[in-house]
Every structure is written in structure tokens, then in C-alpha cells.
Amino acid sequence: MSEASGLRARLVDVLRRDGGLTRDDLTRAFATVPREVFLADGFHSQDAGLLRPGDDGFLAGVYRNDALVTKLADGRPVSSSSQPSLMALMIEELGVAAGMRILEIGAGTGYNAALMAALGADVTSVDVQPDVAAKAADALRTAGVTGARVLIGDGYLGEPSGAPYDRVMVTVGVTGISPHWLAQLVPGGLIVAPVAHAGNNPVLRVWTEPAARIAEPGWPPRTDIWAGGVCGAGFMAAGGALGATYPWAHPASVRAADWAALEEVETARWPQPLDGLRYHDLWFGIGAWDRRTTGAPYDGGTGCVLLDETRTGGAAILADGAILAAGAHAATYASDAGILVDRWADLGMPGIERWRAALVLGGDPAAPIYVPREWSLV
């Protein structure tokens, strides 16, 4: 067994052990599709800088369960290969199967398209960056993948030439769902997308249902597009229409330089801090109830905060339930945050998958998107 094959097998073991990989056919795809081929120009490691094929640690890095940054612009990541466990979860959630036509928004390295093609799907991947699209297409050819094509284009518009699609996979953080994707989707089709929510991009499952009523004079427009939570996540944000804001959106995340010094106002609620997944469950719930919620750096990382109007203060919610606060209205924000945390705990600490929202048109009127309006527990 080659080094790469052994590392692939080890990655598969990790994904299956952690519960992100349950399908046998997808397990075979991860065990056979060579991720290193899709990283021919290397990736940016936090520890070792740019790692290229042949460098010490390159293959080991390729087969860690990590997202790998593949392109920087002014020092900012603009393209990557997503975390394998997240890829597996999204592919399983989408229910990708042989014979399906898949529209992928955001080509990345082409690895995700290769995995779906290995399941027998016909994948059309669209990326707005010509160099990213070209490299992904080259990698797919090198890997011998015949069931996927990569096109240069505005993801907002989808790709009519391959429609209708059974599924839409979105691999870039968006603020809403393009009407073009819905128009190019078969009846009963599904979309899985990371949609902006409270400073994060949790993965949502989007579907349509027959309208509960027909719109009549004096009635609001019918709503038949729904979203449900899948898991917490962070993705690089899309620009243009797919990144447009809307009046009831959460505030943008704040920079470390803008955030005032925090002081503890309420001590820990739980003896053991929530793990990453459960903390994102809490964060999602807080954001569903309070539009002041976003992300901000504190305590060595980025976490959930209620942001005040100055964007330099408010309340931060820690994984152990403690509340930190800063600013002129620190006490008020801390009290509000504590009430929200207790509400979530009293409801049994609901996970992201318990939330559902109707989608309504928002964003740029010239290029609208469907965005969540109000979230409810189901």
C-alpha cells in the first residue's frame, strides 16, 4: 500500500468513527479519490506556510480532517478544499445518488465534485474565478474523473445548460438562496447550502412544499420555500448578489481591534464547557431569537456575542455558559444574553437540526435572494 493510500484509509477511519461518514459507497469514494491530485499547487498551512507536493508533511496534511486554503488574495483566503467530514455530511444530507444531476456552486479544488461523481452523479460545477475553475478542471482530468465538468460563471445564475438538476450543492458562504437555483431544480429537489446566520454560515437544507394557501388580495405572498438546520460551519463568503444583506440580517462580525475589553458578569452555568458542535447549537439558537447576535473574537477564538450599536461592546457567551460584557450598556446586554442562554438550556439544548424557517425574497431587488425570515423549533 502506498503512503497516500494508507493515509486515505486512515482518514476514512476517522470520518467513520466520528459519525460523519455512514454510506458504504461514499466510504469507497473517500478511500479511492486521491485528494492530493486536487492540491497539485499545494496548500497554505498555518504552521508551515505553503506546502507543495514533495514537501515534508504535504501528504499528511492533505489527509488530515481539515479545510485546506489553496488561494490567498491580499493575505485573505479566497478558495479552499473543505474539511472532509463536512463534505461527507453535506453529500449525505443531499442524498447524492447514481444518475442524479448535481449543480455545484463553487468548484474549489474539484475534490468535492470528484467525490459526487464517484457516486455515479453527473456534476456541473460553477466558479466565478477563472483560475480556480481551470485548476479544478485540470485536476478532474488528471484524476480520470469523467462525471464532472467545471464552468466559469456567476454562481447566482446557476447553469441552465445542465438543468434540470436533482440537487444543488453550495460550497461557499451565501446570505440567501438564488431563485435561479430553484428554477433549475426538479420538483421535490433539494439544496444544501451554508447560509449566513449570526456571524456564521451554518449548513441548511432547503426544499419546497406546496403552498398552504393561494395568495388572494390582501394576503401576503404565499410561502412554499423552507430551510432546516443541518450543522454549524464556517465558509468563505460569496460576493455580489449571493452576499447581499437585507434589513433583518444579523450584524456583520466585528474585528478584534474594534472589540472593547471584556469582564465576566455571570459565571459558568455548566461544569463542563460545550464541545464545538453543541456550542454552535447554542449560537444558532441565540441568533434565531435575537437579531443582535454575531461573531466576535475573544478568549483566543471567535464566539457568539450580542453586539451593541457602537459595535465595540455588548455581551459574549462562553462555551461554559459564562457571560462576559463590555461597553456603556454592558449590564443590560449581559442580562439579555443570560436570559437567552437559560431559555436554550430550559428547552433541552436543542440542536441546529431542530430549527426551521420559511424563506422570503430579500437582498438586492435587481438580483434578489431567498432568505430566512423567522426561525421556529420543530
For each of these PLM feature ranges, what is it?
Residues D18, A143, W344-G348:
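Solvent-exposed amphipathic alpha-helical surface segments
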Residues A244, W248-G351, W355-V378:
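Intrinsically disordered, low-complexity terminal regions of plant proteins
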